[in-house]
């Protein structure tokens, strides 16, 4: 539809009558347009663009999953094992068929006595009637393996113990990789996760988690990271001394947690520890042969040694409050200190020649994010057939750079340290210049040319 606005509708008709009995459709057009075609500058004909071809896509997805579950009570009560293998294969084929329109420009139209027109047209862009066909195929394969050992058991009336151990493995492949060597290699991830929980008499709660995860994007010795966490809670409303208050305060729980989380998502920058070399480099000059250039290998990106996981330290303190079994308030105060953030280096001198994409990556940044999360729920059953429910949420968060790889700026205000992420920077307007005297007595204005009264100061 955007082509409709490219040329006035009176410039040409979508098609003209085939008065010369051509073996193709006579699409209208006009010379002098913004598009080059066959030695002419023409306009787009929206109707021709609409009918000149078609595209057909066929997509197929195969999902397969095998699951095995076995209770192991014969070893110890409450123990069970589960294994899951899943496979997905997706493919899409696109077939495009089109022809190149013949465009003609109207010549010498003459109105006749009966109101009709006598005219001719001139070819300004030759096309082809034969259909041109192109086909493309894309797709991917994903395989997941998960094995889980789970344990849950109650000892006596008060001790509730649980444990879980999970092994994860993932492999992702492209069915039709391009000429990029990295895209021909499978993407693989592997990890082991565990959890231990304990609850005493429904009042005192504790949970320990860990993750031992591996990513192929890092070199040997840096591929695996260990990320533990610990959480505790106290359900005060289950205490005996709290029973007189339960008609009003139906639930009261306080909780706290601390843990480490890892991030290996570095976008499309696979294997950043490898230096990338292009064997088809050109334009090299040696010695005094400055008029002669040679071909050879060139480095496109320098590898980064010892690049590893981003690590975030998370702190959380909160409480849950329930009133009259109808109103629920959840409040969480949180803070995350993230370090070893994956960034390109910005402090390499330009004189070294290592600029732009040549710059290596590194674990360079530190960021702090903190704030509060709140949610309020109201549920009231008016009758067995009618219920009133409402929910509201509130979040306040503030982040800032604690450390970042940046030049040693002359002025402190130019640094990003202590400032929010992605903060906009700009000049602060001090008002408008009133007269020429004020302009003459002000610092030089570098954003405009000649400054006049009324301009922004």
Each PLM stretch: what is its role?
Residues 1-98, 106-428:
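Extracellular/periplasmic, surface-exposed regions of secreted and cell-surface proteins
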Residues 427-431, 436:
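Intrinsically disordered, low-complexity terminal/linker regions enriched in Pro/Ser/Gly
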Residues 435-438, 453:
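Alpha-helix N-cap recognition
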Residues 411, 443, 452-457:
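Long C-terminal tail modules that include membrane-anchoring/sorting signals and adjacent low-complexity
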Residues 47, 423, 447-448, 452-455:
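Extracytoplasmic gating/loop element in the C-terminal half of outer-membrane beta-barrel translocons
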Residues 295, 330, 438-447:
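Glycine-rich N-terminal loop/short-helix segment of MobA-like nucleotidyltransferase
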């Amino acid at each position: 539809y955007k082509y409709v606005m490219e040329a006035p509708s009176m410039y040409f008709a979508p098609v003209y009558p085939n008065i010369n009995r051509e073996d193709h459709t006579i699409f209208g057009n006009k010379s002098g347009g913004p598009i080059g075609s066959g030695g002419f500058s023409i306009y787009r004909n929206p109707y021709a663009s609409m009918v000149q071809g078609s595209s057909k896509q066929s997509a197929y997805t195969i999902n397969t999953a095998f699951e095995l579950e076995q209770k192991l009570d014969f070893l110890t009560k409450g123990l069970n094992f589960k294994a899951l293998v899943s496979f997905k294969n997706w493919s899409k084929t696109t077939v495009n068929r089109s022809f190149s329109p013949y465009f003609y420009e109207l010549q010498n139209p003459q109105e006749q006595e009966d109101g009709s027109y006598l005219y001719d047209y001139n070819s300004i862009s030759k096309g082809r009637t034969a259909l041109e066909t192109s086909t493309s195929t894309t797709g991917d394969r994903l395989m997941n393996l998960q094995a889980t050992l789970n344990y849950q058991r109650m000892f006596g009336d008060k001790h509730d113990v649980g444990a879980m151990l999970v092994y994860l493995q993932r492999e992702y492949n492209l069915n039709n990789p391009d000429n990029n060597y990295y895209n021909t290699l499978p993407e693989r991830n592997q990890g082991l996760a565990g959890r231990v929980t304990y609850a005493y008499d429904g009042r005192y709660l504790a949970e320990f988690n860990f993750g031992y995860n591996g990513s192929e994007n890092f070199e040997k010795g840096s591929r695996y990271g260990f990320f533990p966490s610990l959480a505790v809670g106290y359900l005060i409303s289950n205490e005996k001394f709290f029973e007189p208050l339960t008609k009003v305060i139906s639930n009261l729980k306080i909780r706290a947690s601390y843990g480490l989380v890892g991030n290996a998502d570095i976008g499309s920058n696979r294997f950043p520890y490898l230096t990338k070399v292009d064997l088809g480099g050109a334009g090299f000059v040696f010695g005094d042969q400055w008029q002669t250039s040679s071909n050879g290998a060139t480095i496109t990106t320098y590898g980064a040694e010892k690049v590893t996981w981003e690590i975030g330290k998370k702190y959380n303190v909160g409480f849950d409050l329930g009133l009259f079994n109808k109103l629920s308030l959840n409040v969480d105060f949180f803070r995350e200190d993230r370090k070893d953030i994956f960034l390109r280096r910005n402090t390499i001198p330009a004189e070294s020649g290592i600029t732009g994409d040549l710059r290596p990556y590194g674990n360079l940044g530190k960021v702090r994010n903190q704030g509060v999360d709140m949610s309020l729920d109201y549920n009231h059953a008016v009758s067995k057939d009618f219920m009133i429910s409402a929910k509201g949420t509130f979040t306040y968060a503030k982040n800032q750079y604690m450390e970042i790889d940046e030049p040693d700026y002359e002025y402190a205000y130019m640094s990003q340290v202590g400032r929010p992420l992605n903060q906009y920077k700009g000049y602060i307007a001090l008002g408008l210049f009133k007269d020429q005297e004020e302009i003459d007595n002000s610092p030089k204005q570098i954003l405009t040319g000649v400054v006049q009264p009324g301009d922004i100061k």
